[in-house]
């Protein structure tokens, strides 16, 4: 699958913009419910002079879970170590990470749903009792050794909370769901980032980018970088609505944040299957994509915005999607 500019998953260049990320809760735009509760939990932990309880962050990709983990460490005044579920392959990998933590540190595990069950079982006593049980030797000579760990906060992030085992999920004292961002919130993020870039976007330009950002800050900042490219080549030192919309049109990102892949998927439903219902595997074969990719990457936004419906018999194109594509009912 080619890398899409509208993909909520991280691109290599997204990691290069670490300096643009907010460092405190006050700087963090959006997610007011989660942010408000998290602020209370952090303040209470600091008053008690305790480590913050373990935190599970879940929601679609690109909404700021990694940023929030860093902010938690900053607000608590502690260090942070970052890893990902797929990177922890053996018990020794996890033991090495846990043993390197300083008192109060944050351990951030992205894609925590991808931890193996054997790794999870080692994590349970670490989360509950701040200790590590490891087996030394083999066969009759094997013995269990308990290693004490300093108090720490595990922050887990996942796009699939339902894939976490119940024992692991239950060990998180704080669970926060991150929602898609509103247009005003995304416009505020675009405005902030554009100032950091030194290419300030005016209000209408920020809103034009925000409308096409699929409710996701990561996409908003990526689109802004591309619009900035057009501004620099045009020898402009600021971004106005005309330049922004022109650049986004050239990138084939329409006014509601759909790109060519989205249009191809929706049009195939309309033109080849009379709007459905049609099964996921059939759609995948028609547009030449993997069914899992469609379900995980393309569908969430189309469903959330009301372009598609899921029914027991398959996917159905909505009247809203027909109007957006300029199709008459029955086409």
Swiss-Prot record:
Q: Name one GO molecular function term.
A: ATP hydrolysis activity
Coiled-coil ranges per the record? none
Record keyword Calcium present: no
Reaction it catalyzes:
ATP + H2O = ADP + phosphate + H(+)
Keywords (A to Z) from UniProt? ATP-binding, Cytoplasm, DNA damage, DNA recombination, DNA repair, DNA-binding, Hydrolase, Nucleotide-binding
**What EC number(s) would the UniProt record show?**
3.6.4.-
SMART domains for this protein? AAA (SM00382)
Q: What does this protein do?
A: The RuvA-RuvB-RuvC complex processes Holliday junction (HJ) DNA during genetic recombination and DNA repair, while the RuvA-RuvB complex plays an important role in the rescue of blocked DNA replication forks via replication fork reversal (RFR). RuvA specifically binds to HJ cruciform DNA, conferring on it an open structure. The RuvB hexamer acts as an ATP-dependent pump, pulling dsDNA into and through the RuvAB complex. RuvB forms 2 homohexamers on either side of HJ DNA bound by 1 or 2 RuvA tetramers; 4 subunits per hexamer contact DNA at a time.
Entry text on domains: Has 3 domains, the large (RuvB-L) and small ATPase (RuvB-S) domains and the C-terminal head (RuvB-H) domain. The head domain binds DNA, while the ATPase domains jointly bind ATP, ADP or are empty depending on the state of the subunit in the translocation cycle. During a single DNA translocation step the structure of each domain remains the same, but their relative positions change.
Tell me what this protein is called. Answer: Holliday junction branch migration complex subunit RuvB
Q: Which organism is it from?
A: Exiguobacterium sibiricum (strain DSM 17290 / CCUG 55495 / CIP 109462 / JCM 13490 / 255-15)
Gene name of this polypeptide? ruvB
């Amino acid at each position: 699958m080619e890398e899409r500019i509208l993909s909520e998953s991280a691109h290599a260049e997204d990691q290069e913009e670490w300096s643009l990320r907010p460092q405190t809760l006050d700087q963090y735009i959006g997610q007011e419910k989660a942010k408000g509760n998290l602020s209370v939990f952090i303040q209470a932990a600091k008053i008690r002079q305790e480590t913050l309880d373990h935190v599970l962050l879940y929601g679609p990709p690109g909404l700021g879970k990694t940023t929030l983990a860093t902010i938690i460490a900053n607000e608590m005044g502690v260090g942070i170590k970052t890893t990902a579920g797929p990177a922890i392959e053996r018990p020794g990998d996890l033991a090495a990470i846990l043993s390197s933590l300083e008192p109060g540190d944050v351990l951030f595990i992205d894609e925590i749903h991808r931890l193996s069950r054997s790794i999870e079982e080692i994590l349970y006593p670490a989360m509950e009792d701040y200790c590590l049980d490891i087996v030394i030797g083999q066969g009759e000579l094997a013995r269990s050794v308990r290693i004490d760990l300093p108090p720490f906060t595990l922050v887990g992030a996942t796009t699939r909370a339902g894939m976490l085992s119940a024992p692991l999920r239950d060990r998180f004292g704080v669970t926060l769901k991150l929602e898609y961002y509103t247009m005003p919130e995304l416009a505020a993020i675009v405005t902030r980032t554009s100032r950091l870039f030194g290419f300030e976007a005016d209000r209408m330009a920020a809103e034009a980018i925000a409308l096409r950002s699929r409710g996701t800050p990561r996409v908003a900042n990526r689109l802004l970088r591309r619009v900035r490219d057009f501004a620099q080549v045009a020898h402009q030192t600021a971004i106005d609505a005309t330049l922004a919309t022109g650049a986004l049109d050239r990138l084939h990102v329409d006014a509601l944040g759909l790109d060519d892949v989205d249009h191809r998927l929706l049009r195939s439903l309309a033109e080849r299957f009379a709007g459905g219902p049609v099964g996921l595997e059939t759609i995948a074969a028609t547009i030449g994509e993997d069914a899992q990719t469609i379900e995980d990457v393309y569908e969430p936004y189309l469903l959330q915005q009301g372009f598609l419906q899921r029914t027991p018999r398959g996917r159905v194109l909505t009247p809203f999607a027909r109007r957006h594509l300029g199709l008459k009912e029955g086409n």
